[in-house]
């Protein structure tokens, strides 16, 4: 059975500056009618829980060129202005909520510059082994068009948004359908599983 877009869960990470992580969390908490919590740690995390009990995080990212507004212009800023918003797992029906959060952040000063990017992670739990094969094949065949349409910078294509590796695609194409979920989950396709590490290399492929 084909998987429709309305059945697809996703999460996103949006990099921004112009607003501190604390202020971003506080303003989104106001939007949700909840409160912001300082989780701290190396990434200086602030978190907010929405009305459905899902946690949104605002954390430091070293790749962001930080700026703040001063007297109507943008000037260099400290690391507190490095803000990466990490959404929880969202359903298609929650797209409006994500849009509200983004509008809220923009209203209170969030902006992007050439150093900022966005990652979208697609949940594979509703996929079958065959649909995963098909999805990767389609993505591989349309990558050049997608990269051009999204205006992906050459620098990001070489580092943070690399194209699908043909060798990985070929491995998956050759696998029996029954083994794909286990081999993807355990990292056998990628060589290792570092997918839960914030800066692991396996995360930076389209």
Predicted segments, located by residue:
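C-terminal accessory/tail domains of diverse enzymes
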Residues: 1-111, 125-206
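Active-site histidine-anchored catalytic micro-motif
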Residues: 113-115
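Conserved, mostly hydrophobic/aromatic
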Residues: 120
């Amino acid at each position: 059975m084909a998987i429709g877009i309305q059945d697809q869960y996703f999460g996103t990470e949006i990099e921004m500056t112009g607003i501190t992580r604390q202020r971003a969390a506080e303003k989104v908490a106001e939007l949700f009618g909840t409160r912001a919590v300082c989780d701290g740690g190396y990434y200086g995390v602030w978190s907010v829980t929405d009305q459905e009990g899902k946690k949104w995080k605002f954390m430091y990212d070293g790749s962001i060129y930080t700026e703040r507004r001063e007297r109507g212009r943008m000037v260099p800023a400290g690391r507190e202005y490095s803000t990466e918003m990490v959404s929880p797992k969202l359903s298609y029906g929650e797209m409006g909520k994500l849009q509200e959060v983004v509008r809220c952040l923009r209203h209170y000063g969030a902006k992007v510059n050439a150093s900022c990017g966005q990652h979208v992670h697609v949940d594979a739990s509703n996929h079958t082994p065959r649909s995963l094969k098909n999805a990767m094949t389609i993505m591989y065949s349309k990558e050049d068009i997608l990269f051009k349409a999204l205006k992906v910078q050459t620098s990001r294509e070489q580092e943070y948004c690399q194209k699908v590796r043909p060798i990985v695609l070929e491995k998956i194409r050759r696998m029996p359908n029954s083994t794909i979920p286990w081999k993807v989950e355990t990292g056998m396709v990628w060589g290792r599983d570092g997918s839960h590490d914030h800066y692991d290399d396996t995360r930076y492929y389209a």
